[in-house]
Swiss-Prot record:
<dbReference type="Pfam" id="PF00009">
    <property type="entry name" value="GTP_EFTU"/>
</dbReference>
<feature type="compositionally biased region" description="Basic and acidic residues">
    <location>
        <begin position="110"/>
        <end position="131"/>
    </location>
</feature>
<comment type="similarity">
    <text>Belongs to the TRAFAC class translation factor GTPase superfamily. Classic translation factor GTPase family. IF-2 subfamily.</text>
</comment>
<dbReference type="InterPro" id="IPR027417">
    <property type="entry name" value="P-loop_NTPase"/>
</dbReference>
<feature type="binding site">
    <location>
        <begin position="490"/>
        <end position="493"/>
    </location>
    <ligand>
        <name>GTP</name>
    </ligand>
</feature>
<dbReference type="InterPro" id="IPR000178">
    <property type="entry name" value="TF_IF2_bacterial-like"/>
</dbReference>
<feature type="compositionally biased region" description="Basic residues">
    <location>
        <begin position="262"/>
        <end position="275"/>
    </location>
</feature>
<dbReference type="GO" id="GO:0005829">
    <property type="term" value="C:cytosol"/>
</dbReference>
<keyword id="KW-0648">Protein biosynthesis</keyword>
<keyword id="KW-0963">Cytoplasm</keyword>
<keyword id="KW-0396">Initiation factor</keyword>
<comment type="function">
    <text>One of the essential components for the initiation of protein synthesis. Protects formylmethionyl-tRNA from spontaneous hydrolysis and promotes its binding to the 30S ribosomal subunits. Also involved in the hydrolysis of GTP during the formation of the 70S ribosomal complex.</text>
</comment>
<dbReference type="InterPro" id="IPR044145">
    <property type="entry name" value="IF2_II"/>
</dbReference>
<feature type="region of interest" description="G1">
    <location>
        <begin position="390"/>
        <end position="397"/>
    </location>
</feature>
<feature type="binding site">
    <location>
        <begin position="390"/>
        <end position="397"/>
    </location>
    <ligand>
        <name>GTP</name>
    </ligand>
</feature>
<keyword id="KW-0547">Nucleotide-binding</keyword>
<dbReference type="InterPro" id="IPR000795">
    <property type="entry name" value="T_Tr_GTP-bd_dom"/>
</dbReference>
Length: 880
């Protein structure tokens, strides 16, 4: 017995599966889903039950479709109808319209009669219900068509108000107008010939702009859909007074036309926006060209990109200009000075090379600041700096004591000034800064420094003693510094004083008194009693007014160290004379080779001050080391810069000091012994084993030449390291190595400090060289030069060849003719020659730093990974 499934029954009755399943379950059938099967009796009973219900599936489904159509506001797309029915309009114009319509009606009537025959088999209740539904749908369709036509006409009139008035069209009108009117005629014909159609209409596939025949699904008991008229390939022709008839457009055509019309409008809007944006993009934004600078300030080594930024031009333009000038370059290639100047001439501007200032050269910076201060417009009057100079015990400190109203000379050792003292004296609301210099012959450098930083020199000469050697020296210092001299003839109150004799003596040195027709001021004073001291001060102020001494207090402070010392409680202390600008507490400073920040600042009376103006002597603390007298003081913007400059200057000074120190070597041993009257020759001895070290030490200590013997200050086993070099440098000794090598760090340190390292592998050769050097008969003919160092990274053992070492050149180079040493843990394992040198599979003459190579050593195969290979050459040197 054949069985049917639930979904087959639902398909025949055009009812949803869930309704059939529900009904079958109500009838008591064992049904779980639409895939459950029923026999013929169950099917017959189920069908009768479904047909007897008041609700018909097709009616229910059609009501959904009609309600969906009621909600949609359809606008007929004139363009879609025009394209689809263009050929039908052509037939109408040629008289074939009637014949085609008659055939179409006959086909439609035949289909309808066939459908009626099929539906007669249904029961009367279903037929009546279906007829009611058809009538209702036809009425709804007619009403919807009328609304659509009215809205279409209204829209057409709004868009083309003039075209809607035209009824007769000539053959010369445009195809677009023909298609618009043809659409209206097609719609009228469809409305006239259309019969009621069934509710079940399957929409065609949403292919745009394609006039395909709509697909119709035949569903019982629904009437077939009216097919679209066939199109012909003949070219349409039109009569002059021909007016098309309107036809009604089917629902499916309206829906499809509406969709295509909406899509076209969306595309048009989108394309319009895209075109507008493209038009905006097509308009190139013109870059405002910046003018060329008047002067090109360049640095040698700049490339096209750097020059483009300075010239306000693109790098490509710079490269093009250089190409036209015959210079092939790219944007990143460095250019030399001549090329940059040539480019500047091409642009018609001047070129000026930027000079880099070495900020560690504070002497140059000091001079520059002094020149800028003199050219400044914000200059103010400053106190004169006066240096008191003269022979020892002529009364310089006594005069200063009188000026300061203190007893200074009693505190000096032996009555002689031991250091420069700086003091300020107030006279008639004006300040004068005095510097007291030593008068002893041993302090000539201090007198010279005092003359360099002063404005006026007061030369003190004792009336009872006359001109002395230090007096003449003071005159020379003052003249070399270009400083005016005021002569103070002191001790006129003493018996035997003869001021005129002093004036006569000074005339020999170019100091002619004003009273005798010269230009040198002479004042006869007594520092002890204070006679004419006031007149001396007035002369100082008068000379200062003539000189117009000025300074800029707003710029960075610069000064000079008068004296410096190390204080137990305060650290480094420096006496500073501020020459330009204002020095403040907290300023980062560099003084000579030292640096720091001003922590405490005190004046000449011992009081703390926060700032020091020009021509003010102060005492400062906060330096990392003690500077030297006459060192320059410069203030920097920040402490970081001051620290870097100070450290760099200290490093440069140390290197310079090492260059000047001459260490003892075997080459200069004999000369050093004679020059310094040496009694011992200090040697640092290093050997590979303790036995060799002891034997060498005993042999060397037996050597004695002309009362000079060898002193082994240190003996050890192993490679020569940094501590050995440091010890030899501090002891003015040289290093002897027996079968050992120095480390790379120790070798670099020895080269920088000038420590001599001699390496041997024969014990009697050590004895001969040291003894010959002490006798002055050392004649070296060859000198070993290390050319490179290698590290063994891998080894391979090959029969008939031996061990091949894969090595990396750490520094220098190795050649095929080089001597080679195998060093393991600082001990020389073998000293021989290179047997072969290869790079990959090719024999090479040389391998430089940073490359790998394969190397074999003559008569030696005990090479291990991490062994150090030292390549060297023997060079002949002249006898020293």
């Amino acid at each position: 017995m054949a069985k049917k499934r639930i979904y087959e029954v639902a398909k025949e009755l055009d009812i949803e599966n869930k309704i059939v399943v529900k009904k079958a379950q109500d009838l008591g059938f064992d049904v779980k889903s639409h895939m459950s099967s029923l026999d013929d009796k169950q099917v017959s009973k189920l069908v009768d039950s479904l047909k007897s219900t008041n609700t018909t599936p097709s009616t229910e489904k059609d009501s959904k479709n009609s309600s969906r159509k009621e909600k949609a506001k359809i606008k007929v797309s004139v363009g879609a109808i025009r394209r689809r029915d263009n050929k039908n309009e052509h037939d109408n114009r040629h008289g074939n319209n009637k014949h085609r319509n008659n055939n179409f009606k006959k086909q439609q009537n035949n289909r309808r009669e066939n459908e009626d025959k099929k539906t007669t088999s249904a029961k009367p209740a279903a037929r009546d219900l279906l007829n009611k539904f058809k009538k209702k749908q036809r009425a709804e369709a007619s009403e919807l068509n009328a609304q659509t036509e009215a809205s279409r006409r209204k829209w057409h009139q709004e868009q083309n108000p003039q075209r809607s008035k035209v009824k007769k069209v000539e053959n010369t009108r445009k195809p677009k107008e023909e298609k618009l009117e043809g659409a209206a005629a097609v719609k009228a014909r469809v409305q006239a010939s259309q019969k009621p159609v069934g509710p079940k209409i399957i929409k065609p596939s949403p292919a745009r702009n394609k006039a395909k025949r709509p697909t119709v699904k035949k569903v019982e008991p629904i009437a077939p859909v009216v097919p679209a008229p066939q199109k012909e390939e003949t070219k349409p022709t039109r009569k002059k007074d021909f007016t098309r008839k309107k036809r009604e457009v089917p629902d499916y055509e309206r829906e499809r036309s509406e969709h295509s019309d909406k899509a076209r409008r969306r595309r048009n809007k989108k394309n319009k926006r895209i075109n507008q944006s493209k038009e905006v993009k097509k308009q190139p934004t013109q870059r405002k060209e910046r003018p060329l600078p008047e002067t090109l300030v360049y640095e040698e080594g700049m490339n096209a990109q750097d020059l483009g930024k300075l010239l306000h031009r693109e790098p490509a333009e710079i490269v093009k200009k250089l190409f036209m000038l015959g210079v092939m370059t790219n944007q990143n290639q460095s250019l030399d000075k001549d090329t940059i100047e040539l480019l500047a001439a091409e642009y018609g501007i001047e070129a000026e090379e930027k000079v880099h200032e070495d900020i560690s050269d504070i002497d140059t910076l000091y001079t520059k600041e002094m020149e800028e201060s003199k050219a400044s417009k914000h200059q103010e009057k400053r106190p004169p700096v006066v240096t008191i100079m003269g022979h020892v015990d002529h009364g310089k400190t006594t005069l200063l004591d009188r000026l300061r109203h203190t007893n200074v000379s009693e505190h000096e050792a032996g009555g002689i000034t031991q250091r420069i003292g700086a003091y300020q004296v107030r006279i008639d609301d004006r300040l004068i800064t005095f510097l007291d210099t030593p008068g002893h012959a041993a302090f000539s450098n201090m007198r010279a420094r005092g003359a360099e930083i002063t404005d006026i020199v007061i030369l003190v000469v004792a009336a009872d003693d006359g001109v002395m050697p230090q007096t003449i020296e003071a005159i020379d210092h003052a003249k070399s510094a270009g400083v005016p001299i005021i002569v103070a003839v002191n001790k006129i109150d003493k018996p035997g004083a003869n001021p005129d004799h002093v004036m006569e003596q000074l005339m020999k040195y170019g100091l002619v008194p004003e009273d005798w027709g010269g230009d040198t001021i002479f004042v006869k004073i007594s520092a002890k009693t204070g006679k004419n001291v006031e007149e001396l001060l007035q002369m100082i102020l008068l000379q200062a007014d003539v000189m117009e001494l000025k300074a800029d207090p707003d710029q960075k402070a610069i000064g000079t160290v008068i004296e410096a010392r190390l204080d137990k409680g305060r650290g480094s202390v420096a006496d500073i004379l501020v020459q330009q600008g204002t020095l403040k507490v907290g300023d980062p400073i560099v003084v000579g080779d030292t640096f720091g920040r001003v922590r405490v600042m005190t004046n000449d009376k011992g009081r703390r001050v926060k700032k020091a103006t020009p021509s003010t002597p102060v005492e400062i603390t906060g330096l990392n080391d003690v500077p030297e007298a006459a060192d320059k003081l410069v203030v920097f913007d920040d402490e970081k810069t001051a620290r870097s400059v100070g450290e760099q200057r200290a490093k440069n000074a140390l290197e310079k000091q090492r260059e000047n120190v001459q260490h003892v070597t075997l080459d200069n041993l004999f000369d050093t012994m004679k020059k310094e009257n040496m009694k011992e020759v200090d040697i640092v001895l290093k050997a590979d084993v303790q036995g060799s070290a002891e034997a060498l030490q005993q042999s060397l200590e037996k050597i004695e030449v002309e009362g000079v013997r060898v002193n082994i200050i240190h003996s050890g086993v192993g490679a020569i390291n940094e501590s050995d070099v440091t010890l030899a440098g501090a002891s003015n000794a040289f290093i002897v190595g027996f079968n050992v090598r120095p480390t790379n760090t120790a070798k670099s340190q020895a080269d920088s400090e000038g420590v001599d390292i001699r390496l041997y592998n024969i014990i009697y050769k050590v004895m001969d060289d040291v003894e010959a050097a002490m006798k002055g008969m050392l004649e070296p003919t060859y000198e070993e030069k290390v050319t490179g160092n290698l590290t063994v990274r891998e080894t391979w053992k090959v029969s008939k060849i031996g061990t091949i070492a894969g090595a990396f050149v750490d520094n220098g180079y190795v050649t095929r003719d080089s001597g080679i040493r195998v060093i393991r843990d600082g001990i020389v394992k073998y000293d021989g020659k290179v047997a072969s040198l290869k790079r990959f599979k090719d024999d090479v003459k040389e391998v430089k730093q940073g490359f790998d190579c394969g190397i074999t050593i003559e008569n030696f195969n005990d090479i291990k990974v991490d062994d150090q290979l030292e390549a060297y050459e023997m060079q002949e040197v002249p006898v020293k």
